[in-house]
Amino acid sequence: MLKVESISKDYREFKLREISFDVREGEHFIILGPSGSGKTVLLEIIAGIISPDRGRILLRGEDITGLPPEKRNFSYIPQNYALFPHMTVFDNIAFGLKLRKIPRKEVARKVREVAESLGIDHLLHRKPRTLSGGEQQRVAIARALVVKPELLLMDEPFANLDVQTKSKLIREMKRWRKEFGFTAIHVTHSFEEALSLGDRVGIMLRGRLVQVGDVRDVFSKPKSEEVARFLGFENIIEGVANGRILKVGDLRIELPREVWGKVRVGIRPEDITIFMEGVKTSARNVFKARVEGIEDLGALVKLTLNLGGIILRAFITRSSLIELGIREGEEVYASFKASAIHVFP
């Protein structure tokens, strides 16, 4: 449907370099990256707000690079929602329809239909300043969807919401997508949004799109250490592999496949299980470790473990920490399955 070809742009402090990807019909495509990676600049180029220095954008095979925003039939939701403060919710949602010269009765019908679907039909007489953050976001989404855009562009759509409201809107976004059948490009730094909503994801680091693929594949099989570290592979180990065994100091770690020579592997902290004593487990990698640090992260706790000079980090729940009575300086057992190990190419 949409094809982005070799887009480059120097814009203020941002630099985009040779960005290329495609978006399929009906897909929810996530652009995931840290703050300052150029995600918003890329989205605004796709929207037609900013012109690229090089490259082009194709919609169904037609070059739309020079087409102004109002000619693209895209809906763009900026991070601050950009609702008109002097207008009611009804008039905000109706704005795009009125620009398209839609008859008044049809405007009213379409606005009420989308408002009912998004659960804001009781707010149509209100002004944006009287709404909660979640309600404002629903209004912004309604305004975007009511015109039936070919492409929905969303810039950090849930960034300004509290955790509970965000989780609810993510669940509802799935339902709205089924109901309205839209195609979306969604910019975010949130792993939760990417994993919950995305079909495919593009990882953006330092102005470059460094990996594109199915969301689950990218999260489980990052192509580089840079991508892996961004995606939460805190444990990256170097050793010498002999078939399915990796030698790291005095440790012998079973690998998911045969590898030979010097390699580097990654293990997510959440894939490491902690026991206070040796137990039977399907995991082939079980090691004694000393707890060198305990970091409180709220619902989770991060443990820093020393496995014979090899430092690993593991997540456990707060309740597990209390139940097991884990303290700094104590010895525990750390286990992880061979299938949880990612071998870098």
Curated annotation (Swiss-Prot):
SMART domains: AAA. Its main location: membrane. It comes from the Archaea. It is an enzyme of class 7 (translocase). It is a peripheral membrane protein. It is found in: Cell membrane. The complex is composed of two ATP-binding proteins (WtpC), two transmembrane proteins (WtpB) and a solute-binding protein (WtpA). InterPro entries: AAA+_ATPase, ABC_SmlMolc_Importer, ABC_transporter-like_ATP-bd, ABC_transporter-like_CS, Mo/tungstate-bd_C_term_dom, Molybdate/tungstate_ABC-ATPase, Mop_domain, P-loop_NTPase. Belongs to the ABC transporter superfamily. Sulfate/tungstate importer (TC 3.A.1.6) family. Keywords: ATP-binding, Cell membrane, Membrane, Molybdenum, Nucleotide-binding, Translocase, Transport. Transmembrane segments: none annotated. One of its GO terms (cellular component) is plasma membrane. It comes from Pyrococcus horikoshii (strain ATCC 700860 / DSM 12428 / JCM 9974 / NBRC 100139 / OT-3). This is Molybdate/tungstate import ATP-binding protein WtpC. The lineage of its organism: Archaea, Methanobacteriati, Methanobacteriota, Thermococci, Thermococcales. ATP binds at G33, P34, S35, G36, S37, G38, K39, T40. Residues 2-231 form the ABC transporter domain. Residues 280-345 form the Mop domain. Part of the ABC transporter complex WtpABC involved in molybdate/tungstate import. Responsible for energy coupling to the transport system.
